[in-house]
């Protein structure tokens, strides 16, 4: 698990890892692949303030979420890739 704690209404997401893609005998480089838009919430911020009251986040650690293609900031920690995104950039929680 990452040693990163998001602030405010931000969420730390571990994007779903895509299997290596191969077309015929040619490997598709990471730069040509579509970015995943699904991931697992690994850490959440404390929430956001509205009218002086702290509003907790709706998503929880462990939720699988869908988010916009260009949402968030990509970071690396402990050899893994993560996204820090605002809760408002999360489009849905995937129910299993």
Curated annotation (Swiss-Prot):
Heptamer of 7 subunits arranged in a ring. Interacts with the chaperonin GroEL. Keywords: Chaperone, Cytoplasm, Stress response. It comes from the Bacteria. Together with the chaperonin GroEL, plays an essential role in assisting protein folding. The GroEL-GroES system forms a nano-cage that allows encapsulation of the non-native substrate proteins and provides a physical environment optimized to promote and accelerate protein folding. GroES binds to the apical surface of the GroEL ring, thereby capping the opening of the GroEL channel. Its main location: cytoplasm. Belongs to the GroES chaperonin family. One of its GO terms (cellular component) is cytoplasm. It comes from Leptospira interrogans serogroup Icterohaemorrhagiae serovar copenhageni (strain Fiocruz L1-130). This is Co-chaperonin GroES. GO terms for molecular function: ATP binding; metal ion binding; protein folding chaperone; protein-folding chaperone binding; unfolded protein binding. The lineage of its organism: Bacteria, Pseudomonadati, Spirochaetota, Spirochaetia, Leptospirales. CDD domains: cpn10. Induction: By heat shock. GO terms for biological process: chaperone cofactor-dependent protein refolding. It is found in: Cytoplasm. PANTHER family: 10 KDA HEAT SHOCK PROTEIN (PTHR10772), CO-CHAPERONIN GROES (PTHR10772:SF58). Signal peptide: none annotated. Pfam families: Cpn10.
């Amino acid at each position: 698990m990452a040693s990163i704690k998001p602030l405010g209404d931000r969420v730390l997401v571990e994007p779903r890892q895509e299997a290596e893609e191969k077309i015929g005998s040619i490997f598709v480089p990471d730069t040509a692949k579509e970015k995943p838009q699904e991931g697992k919430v690994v850490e959440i911020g404390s929430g956001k303030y509205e009218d002086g009251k702290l509003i907790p986040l709706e998503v929880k650690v462990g939720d699988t979420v869908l988010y916009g293609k260009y949402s968030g900031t990509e970071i690396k920690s402990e050899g893994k890739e993560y996204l820090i995104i605002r809760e408002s950039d999360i489009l849905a929680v995937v129910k299993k």
